[in-house]
Curated annotation (Swiss-Prot):
Annotated ranges, domain ELM2: 38-123
Low complexity: compositionally biased ranges: 422-449
Gene: rcor2
Span of domain SANT: 124-175, 328-379
InterPro entries: ELM2_dom (IPR000949), Homeodomain-like_sf (IPR009057), REST_helical (IPR049048), SANT/Myb (IPR001005), SANT_dom (IPR017884), Trans_reg/Corepressor (IPR051066)
Stretches assigned to coiled coil: 283-315
Species this chain originates from: Danio rerio (Zebrafish)
Name used for this protein in its record: REST corepressor 2
Keyword set, alphabetical order: Coiled coil, Nucleus, Repeat, Repressor, Transcription, Transcription regulation
């Protein structure tokens, strides 16, 4: 069974070795550029010689792997001066550290010349930190802080990038109770106290418990070195006493200062007064307590006074505070805003500031541009005339009522006159019915445009009785009064009516002279025909 197993292993090894040899042969053939590179070589000449399998070799290989590698062993052939010069050259010129340089020298069997020649053939691993490098870095960091250029002066074989990388990895694993931290605290306390007495600093109980543990170890080593086992007991008791003294400040070592805090000063007279009698300290404390209570009362009283003043100040500030606009200025005109602007023009006329205040979200310039842009669309000129007429009416309200009454009475008289004036103008006998009807129809067509109200006002219904037509409302006469230059008592609608009746009489005379109809109507029917189209 063992032979079969060894045969299998040998075959597998043969395959692997043949593959390696074939690759190696192909590389050599490619280097030599033979023409038959793609040929497969078969035969015993092209096979590797495989040694027999020895199971004892595996254990020996394992033992070798578990052993540590020797880096350096001193030799009398190399002097200390030569060794220092070799290490300095390896560090400055090739970037080796001390351990790597000594390993190279041991590899060449303490031959300095061969080691110096072989240093340039290898590149040292830059991130490898020895214990010595770590201690030097902590010392440099305690002195210089994060000034990595100064730290590099203490570690010349390290690059700044390597120092920064190691700093962040060291910062994560850094503990508060390290030796360098304790040394930094001691230096800080020395700087703050500004004392030159080093013995007081060494006897200061403001150290950590780890420092005491290290002191225990050192004392134990000293006792073991001296061989006095019985001396361990009193040393432990002394250390426990020290621990009890420093237990109060173990987490806050900076509180164990000899000087009082800022703002407190020790005077000899006060100390003498306190030490004179036992009750003086209690009396002083009571006085300080009463003083503290009185000061607290004063603070509370001042707070109450401030709150009252603050409330009084807040009562009247709202009246003096300017009002913020509720609506933002918007240049777009909605339908509601347009209608509101038209009504505001009817109310305020061209007072654009008042119109802008009514709308709320428009400026005076926007209102004026609206008046110019929408003047024809909303007939703002007529609306403005109505406002002007209303202002004139409000200025002379009594006179306006009288003029309206006189105008209505004169309108009735003129209509009666129009009925009586038409027959005398006829040169021939009475006009025919057709002529009178055509004349009345033309007068009826010409009279309504003169008595129509403005476009924004509702016209009178055609089926209204004659009494309403003879007395128009004030809104219909107001725009017509503005057209007269001097506000004469007779309205302007009467004169065109008289002229039209004269023109109609002339037309009737011409028609009666040319017509050959024999039927003639009495004069009384002419006046009746004039009112008949208006009643319809």
């Amino acid at each position: 069974m063992e032979r079969s197993g060894s045969g299998v292993l040998s075959r597998s090894r043969a395959k692997t070795v043949t593959n390696g040899n074939s690759q190696h042969s192909e590389e050599e053939s490619s280097d030599e550029e033979h023409p038959n590179d793609s040929m497969i070589r078969v035969g015993g000449d092209y096979q590797a010689q495989i040694p027999e399998f020895k199971p004892d070799c595996a254990s020996r290989y394992g033992e070798k792997d578990q052993r540590s590698m020797l880096v350096w062993s001193p030799n009398s052939q190399v002097s200390d001066a030569m060794l220092d010069e070799y290490i300095l050259m390896a560090k400055e010129k090739h970037g080796y550290n001390m351990e790597q340089a000594l390993g190279m020298l041991l590899w060449h069997k303490h031959d300095v010349e061969k080691s110096l020649a072989d240093l340039a053939n290898f590149t040292p691993f830059p991130d490898e930190w020895t214990v010595e490098d770590k201690v030097l870095f902590e010392q440099a960091f305690s002195f210089h802080g994060k000034s990595f250029h100064r730290i590099q002066q203490m570690l010349p074989d390290k690059m700044i990038t390597s120092l920064v990388k190691y700093y962040y990895s060291w910062k994560k694993t850094r503990t508060r109770t390290s030796v360098m931290d304790r040394q930094a605290r001691k230096l800080l306390s020395k700087r703050e106290k500004n004392e030159s007495n080093d013995e007081i600093e060494e006897g200061d109980p403001g150290s950590d418990s780890d420092f005491e543990i290290n002191a225990k170890k050192e004392s134990a080593k000293q006792n073991s070195g001296n061989g006095g086992g019985n001396e361990k007991g009193p040393s432990k008791s002394c250390l426990t006493r020290k621990e009890n003294q420093s237990a109060q400040y173990r987490h806050h070592p900076l509180r164990a200062r000899r000087r009082p805090p800022k703002g407190m000063h020790l005077e000899q007279e006060d100390i003498v007064a306190l030490s004179a009698s036992t009750d003086s300290g209690a009396v002083t404390i009571r006085q300080l307590d009463t003083q503290l209570v009185s000061l607290k009362r004063q603070v509370q009283k001042i707070k109450q006074t401030n709150s009252v003043l603050r409330n009084n100040l807040g009562d009247g500030i709202e009246d003096m505070r300017p009002r913020e606009p509720n609506q933002k200025i918007n240049s777009r005109w909605t339908t509601e805003e347009q209608l509101l602007a038209v009504q505001a023009v009817r109310r305020y006329g061209k007072d654009f500031a008042a119109i802008a205040d009514v709308i709320g979200n428009k400026t005076v310039a926007q209102v004026s541009s609206f008046f110019v842009s929408y003047r024809r669309r909303f007939n703002l000129e007529e609306v403005l005339r109505e406002w002007q007429a209303e202002q004139e009416v409000q200025g002379s309200s009594g006179r306006t009522v009288n003029t309206e009454l006189n105008g209505s009475a004169e309108l009735e008289d003129d209509e009666v006159k129009m009925d009586g004036i038409s027959p005398p103008h006829s040169d021939s006998p009475l006009p025919s019915s057709e002529g009178s009807a055509s004349g009345n129809h033309s007068s009826a067509q010409s009279s309504p445009p003169l008595t129509q109200p403005p476009p924004l006002l509702r016209p009178a219904p055609p089926s209204a009785p004659p009494s309403l037509l003879r007395q128009p409302p004030p809104l219909q006469t107001r725009p017509l009064q503005n057209r007269t230059p001097h506000n004469h008592p007779p309205p302007p609608l009467i004169r065109p009516a008289i002229a039209s009746t004269l023109h109609q009489g002339a037309l009737r005379n011409s028609l009666s002279s040319s017509s050959s109809s024999a039927g003639q109507l009495p004069p009384s029917l002419v006046g009746l025909k004039v009112e008949s189209p208006q009643s319809h």
